[in-house]
């Protein structure tokens, strides 16, 4: 096949991140300079985000059997890149005090993982699916354990390595069964084969169903859905804040995109079984995640269980696609994921800012007790954190409310009555632990002898604080005036009249 400039433009995001990876790798080999490599990484992510605008204008988007750069994938590419950019900015301060000479490789691993995320968002082939899954997971083994001097980080890395290996084996075995049943690895070919009823053998239908089921189990591990969630709180607690952010945003978003695309391949006769499966997992994830978050005293563990619940909420949209192929499902999932990504960036950004100012290593910087009375020393930071937490809770006048409103309307319109009510009740439970965090900020302050005095008396503008301010403003603005967001989603997913 003749490769044209149009095809190169379609591949620009992944080519830019790939070239940035090579440049950073060669630069590290020549001379170690953390500021230079941070700047190169941020520039690469920013350029890749800008290049998505060029991809948007192209029409021949499905030019290879391996990948499919279409309207569906563009949103997820943007979210993966924004998450990678935010993680790069937040990591810089932490790497400045990192007690080792291997600081620069952090960005190398982050870039490679982002390539895997883009591949997952654009995959149209089971081989590329597995390649993207491994590319996004393998660098995370090192990134999660980057704080090797911290026992929690080592424990988190080991747990993630073991369970990620298990999930990859499920996905690979599922791919093998689907290939054995259909003889194809391309999503397009598999879809045509199944929809035209060319497979007449009950054995082949059974094998393809089991294969997809095993792949969904693997995706459940990656998405930390109940009952595949056991690694999540420990990994979020042990990993650096910037990597916890990356895990809860980019890693999950890429897997959600490939899950939706894969489920859309299979015809309607497969949907009933998987709807029941996803309904059970969604209910358990929403309820269990919120209940377990109530008794946590570590803010990272609270957000870990919160992410389990939020992933359960997203499954409303996935089920709506499977059950009735609702025309608003993709738009609803997109709006909810945008709100979730922005609020997660803000939450972990503030955690990163607060933890940086502790002078003693024996201080549990992620304890909720640390945030007690924060308003009386850092009122600006506390107000921003309040806005972000309210958005996570889905309180009106925030972007989180718009996302949940769309989800619940979609559930009702898809006639998922009891499921939507159950999810709404689970969401009410979450208000308890979110308000607990907010109230903690405004209580009487504690003795903060072990905190950098600059933190208690000044507000200096730094890149991580700029990100938190931008995110908080976006949450408020789009919560009060969501028309720009809805217009953006209509550009990606034109409404069906």
Swiss-Prot record:
Q: Which reaction does it catalyse?
A: a quinone + NADH + 5 H(+)(in) = a quinol + NAD(+) + 4 H(+)(out)
Q: Which GO terms describe its molecular function?
A: NADH dehydrogenase (ubiquinone) activity; NADH:ubiquinone reductase (non-electrogenic) activity; quinone binding
In what way does this protein cross or attach to the membrane? Multi-pass membrane protein
Q: Native species of this protein?
A: Blochmanniella pennsylvanica (strain BPEN)
Complexes and interactors: NDH-1 is composed of 13 different subunits. Subunits NuoA, H, J, K, L, M, N constitute the membrane sector of the complex.
Q: According to its UniProt record, which protein family does this protein belong to?
A: Belongs to the complex I subunit 2 family.
Q: Keywords on this record?
A: Cell inner membrane, Cell membrane, Membrane, NAD, Quinone, Translocase, Transmembrane, Transmembrane helix, Transport, Ubiquinone
Gene Ontology, cellular component aspect: plasma membrane
According to its UniProt entry, the protein's GO biological process terms are: ATP synthesis coupled electron transport
Subcellular compartments = Cell inner membrane
Q: Which HAMAP family match?
A: NDH1_NuoN_1
The enzyme's E.C. designation: 7.1.1.-
The UniProt entry, under Pfam families, shows: Proton_antipo_M
Q: What does this protein do?
A: NDH-1 shuttles electrons from NADH, via FMN and iron-sulfur (Fe-S) centers, to quinones in the respiratory chain. The immediate electron acceptor for the enzyme in this species is believed to be ubiquinone. Couples the redox reaction to proton translocation (for every two electrons transferred, four hydrogen ions are translocated across the cytoplasmic membrane), and thus conserves the redox energy in a proton gradient.
Q: Which domain of life is it from?
A: Bacteria
Q: What class of enzyme is it?
A: translocase
Q: Its gene?
A: nuoN
The name under which this protein is listed is: NADH-quinone oxidoreductase subunit N
Primary location: membrane
> Where are the bilayer-spanning segments?
8-28, 35-55, 72-92, 105-125, 126-146, 170-190, 210-230, 246-266, 274-294, 302-322, 333-353, 383-403, 426-446, 466-486
């Amino acid at each position: 096949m003749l490769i044209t400039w149009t095809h190169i433009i379609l591949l620009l995001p992944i080519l830019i991140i790939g070239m940035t990876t090579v440049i950073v790798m060669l630069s590290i080999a020549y001379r170690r300079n953390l500021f230079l490599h941070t700047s190169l990484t941020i520039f690469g992510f920013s350029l890749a985000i800008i290049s998505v605008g060029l991809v948007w204008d192209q029409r021949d988007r499905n030019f290879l059997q391996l990948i499919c750069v279409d309207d569906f994938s563009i949103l997820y590419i943007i979210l993966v890149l924004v998450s990678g950019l935010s993680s790069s900015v937040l990591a810089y301060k932490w790497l400045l005090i990192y007690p080792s000479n291997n600081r620069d490789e952090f960005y190398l691993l982050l870039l490679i993982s982002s390539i895997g995320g883009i591949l997952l968002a654009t995959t149209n082939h089971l081989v590329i699916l597995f390649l993207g899954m491994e590319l996004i997971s393998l660098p995370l083994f090192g990134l999660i354990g980057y704080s090797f001097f911290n026992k929690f980080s080592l424990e988190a890395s080991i747990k993630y390595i073991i369970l990620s290996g298990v999930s990859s084996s499920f996905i690979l075995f599922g791919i093998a069964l689907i290939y054995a049943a259909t003889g194809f690895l391309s999503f397009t070919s598999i879809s045509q084969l199944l929809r035209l009823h060319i497979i007449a053998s009950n054995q082949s239908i059974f094998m393809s169903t089991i294969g997809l089921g095993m792949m969904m189990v693997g995706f459940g591990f990656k998405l930390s859905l109940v009952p595949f969630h056991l690694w999540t709180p420990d990994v979020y607690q042990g990993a650096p804040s910037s990597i916890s952010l990356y895990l809860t945003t980019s890693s999950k978003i890429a897997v959600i995109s490939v899950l939706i695309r894969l489920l859309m391949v299979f015809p309607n006769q497969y949907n009933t079984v998987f709807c029941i499966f996803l309904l059970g997992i969604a209910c358990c994830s929403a309820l269990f995640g919120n209940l377990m978050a109530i008794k946590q005293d570590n803010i990272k563990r609270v957000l870990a269980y919160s992410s389990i619940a939020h992933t359960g909420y997203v499954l409303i949209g996935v089920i709506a696609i499977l059950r009735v192929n609702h025309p608003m499902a993709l738009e609803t999932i997109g709006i909810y994921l945008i709100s979730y990504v922005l609020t997660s960036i803000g939450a972990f950004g503030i955690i990163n800012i607060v933890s940086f100012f502790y002078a003693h290593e024996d201080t549990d910087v992620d304890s909720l007790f640390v945030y007690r009375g924060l308003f009386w020393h850092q009122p600006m930071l506390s107000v921003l954190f309040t806005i972000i937490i309210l958005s996570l809770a889905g309180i009106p006048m925030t972007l989180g409310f718009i996302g949940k409103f769309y989800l619940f309307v979609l559930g009702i319109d898809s006639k998922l009555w009891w499921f939507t009510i159950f999810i709404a009740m689970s969401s009410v439970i979450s208000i308890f632990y979110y308000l607990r965090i907010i109230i903690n900020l405004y209580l009487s302050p504690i003795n903060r002898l072990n905190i950098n005095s600059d933190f208690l008396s000044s507000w200096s503008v730094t890149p991580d604080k700029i990100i938190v301010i931008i995110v908080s403003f976006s949450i408020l603005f789009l919560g009060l005036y969501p028309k720009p967001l809805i217009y953006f989603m209509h550009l990606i997913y034109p409404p069906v009249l």
